Amino acid sequence: MAEESLLPSHTEDVSASPNKSSSLLSEISNASTRPFVLAFTVGSCGALSFGCIVGYTAPTQSSIMKDLNLSIADFSFFGSILTVGLILGALICGKLADLVGRVYTIWITNILVLIGWLAIAFAKDVRLLDLGRLLQGISVGISSYLGPIYISELAPRNLRGAASSLMQLFVGVGLSAFYALGTAVAWRSLAILGSIPSLVVLPLLFFIPESPRWLAKVGREKEVEGVLLSLRGAKSDVSDEAATILEYTKHVEQQDIDSRGFFKLFQRKYALPLTIGVVLISMPQLGGLNGYTFYTDTIFTSTGVSSDIGFILTSIVQMTGGVLGVLLVDISGRRSLLLFSQAGMFLGCLATAISFFLQKNNCWETGTPIMALISVMVYFGSYGLGMGPIPWIIASEIYPVDVKGAAGTVCNLVTSISSWLVTYSFNFLLQWSSTGTFMMFATVMGLGFVFTAKLVPETKGKSLEEIQSAFTDSTSEDSTIF
């Protein structure tokens, strides 16, 4: 199946032809069916829950420690066990989604989240508290990759980027809401509130469609066209789309008939997409995201900025960047937003490093706090614009259905380990050198900019089958890359 190249140097604007505007309006209209909207709402709920889960511990720390008589070590373990759950969820997410399907996996993640919140809400000691947090981590580890996959496999090509980008906004909404509510609501009540999204979603899961690409993969070809009709509208002609999905699925199966299991992912033909997915998804973590997120108060305090003002402004900027990303991702494209976002995060890290250097050497004392505040705002705004949602969008687009589960496991595992590494080491790095720490983060983002410019293709406007075949058909070698 020969397709045009997706290499950056040959990228074209597939929506630039005169007839594309009417086609785009038609696809948007067709996509606005009840099953599509319902599926999008349900599929994105994992991101909303993720934001609530991450935002829960900061405002509730003192009250939980007081009520349950916990030590600092107890609460630190409660906070960090989420990462253990993330890693466990990452290890099983791909196999689970491939084995039982996208919808049943969403069932499992929402049940885990619900049990986790209830365990925390009714905890009498640290053991039940930790169990609830662990279950939440497993759920997030699964849903953080499953959500973008499910949305990308259902959405029409012209809405795929915007629909997936909205998931990052849901994370921000959940995070901001729980930060705000946590100052006014008791920690047990806040946990009950956290269970509401799952309680709403569970009955809706009876009415959402399974991914047509997963149906094709498991041999349920007769159901593919019916699902597409429900998603695009009963009057839509989905025969070409259904034929493309079925043809490409058979094409992949014929190529890999002698290759089975997890290690199929490590064939040479998957080397480039695997590298792109792993690097892009881990880059924000290695570029200091968790350091900024969990230790913003430390950064502001060290440079003389009011943490309350800093948090409010950075939240507004990040949400604004996220909204702009949703609006622009299917217009300007993934690659250009990635480059702009990486450049902004690089400048934010660099400016933060300079502000620490000036503060340490007692230079420009009146301007250093303002510089620190602006640098953090630039970092978070740039992250929300591109590096937040787009790596997950691209990772959900570039892998064929037969290795998508394995790729999800690898990408999720790498980002979970990267997240833990930066979170664990950040305070030690600050003690070593505040300036040096943020210079390291700036270096990561600078290298990421070069990586994206050289290797990351533009996927805007392409069908999933076009994107995937452009990678996998570039070589017929089946030898592994290690």
From Swiss-Prot:
CDD domains: MFS_GLUT6_8_Class3_like (cd17358)
Spans traversing the lipid bilayer: 36-56, 72-92, 103-123, 134-154, 166-186, 189-209, 271-291, 309-329, 337-357, 370-390, 410-430, 436-456
Disordered, as annotated region: 1-20
Membrane protein topology class: Multi-pass membrane protein
Listed GO MF terms: sugar transmembrane transporter activity
Keywords attached to this entry: Membrane, Sugar transport, Transmembrane, Transmembrane helix, Transport
Protein location: Membrane
One GO CC term on file: mitochondrion
InterPro entries, alphabetized: MFS_dom (IPR020846), MFS_ERD6/Tret1-like (IPR044775), MFS_sugar_transport-like (IPR005828), MFS_trans_sf (IPR036259), MFS_Trehalose_Transporter (IPR050549), Sugar/inositol_transpt (IPR003663), Sugar_transporter_CS (IPR005829)
Similarity annotation: Belongs to the major facilitator superfamily. Sugar transporter (TC 2.A.1.1) family.
Known function: Sugar transporter.
Protein name, UniProt field: Sugar transporter ERD6-like 14
Protein's organism: Arabidopsis thaliana
Upper lineage: Eukaryota, Viridiplantae, Streptophyta, Embryophyta, Tracheophyta
